[in-house]
Amino acid sequence: VIPVVYATSQLYSQKQFQKLNYPYTLDTLYNNAVVEKGSSTYQSQFKVLNLGLDDSYTIHQKKKTNKTYKLLQSLKNKILVLEFDVQNKKPKQAVSITINGIKNKLSKITSPYYNQNTHFTYLISNIKNDELIVSFSKGNYKLKNLKAYTLDDSIIKDREKEVDSLSLETGKDLINGTIDVSNSGYLITHLPYDQGYQIQIDEKNVKSEIVNTAFLGCKISKGKHRISIQFKPKGYHSGFVLSYLGMMIVVFNYIYERKKKNEE
C-alpha cells in the first residue's frame, strides 16, 4: 500500500498521461507521480486478455440470476480488469451486474439522481479457482465492447519499496512528520488539491502544486526534511480579521455606553 505522504523521483508528464486510455492509466499512475514536467518513460504493464467471449451479449430475464464462468487460463498472482458498455432496453428499470463481489449499477432513468453509468469497469484480484461469479439483475439489456486485461500483482506490491514514506508524528498540524528523500523529486499526498493547504518543508512555506491529476504535492530536494501541512480555508485570514474587528467594535460600543451612563 502506498503511504499517505511520500516522495518519489519517478515523474510522469501530465501531457503524456492524458494520452493514455484506461486501464493503462492505472499502473502508470501507481508507479509514477504525474506532474506538469515529468520525464519518466514508464510503459504500462497491462496485457490484453482473450476470454473467449463474444463481443456482445443480450440479457433478458425476469429475475436476478447468478452464473459461474471458468477462465481459460490461470490468473494466479494477477489482477484482472474487465470493462464493457451497457445498453438498457428498459431504461425505467435499473441494471446491476456484480462480478466476484464488485458491483456496478446503472440507475433507472426516472431516478432523481440518474447516474448515467453506461460503462461498467471491474478491478478484480485474488480470483479463486480461476472462476468469475457473475450476478445479473433482472431486466432487458445488452452488454457490448467487452474487454479484459491482466497485470502481474508484483508490479503493485513492489511499489511501496520504491518510494520514501513520511514518518508521521502527532502535532497540531493536519500532517506532521519527517522524511528522508533518496533523490530530488516531488512530495506526494493523498489530499485533494485545495488552495487552502499550506505545505512547509523545514519550517519554510513552499509552493504547492496539483499532482496525480487532482492531489496536493510539491517539489522536494534530496535529504532529510521536516514536513508539516496545514489547512486554512480560502478567506480564513480576512474572515478572522473581520471577526476580530467586529468584536472590537462591540467592545468599544459597550465601553462607550458605560462611560456615557456614568457621565449622566
Regions found by a protein language model. Give the residues of each.
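Active-site-proximal, structured, solvent-exposed surfaces of multi-pass membrane proteins
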Residues: 1-264
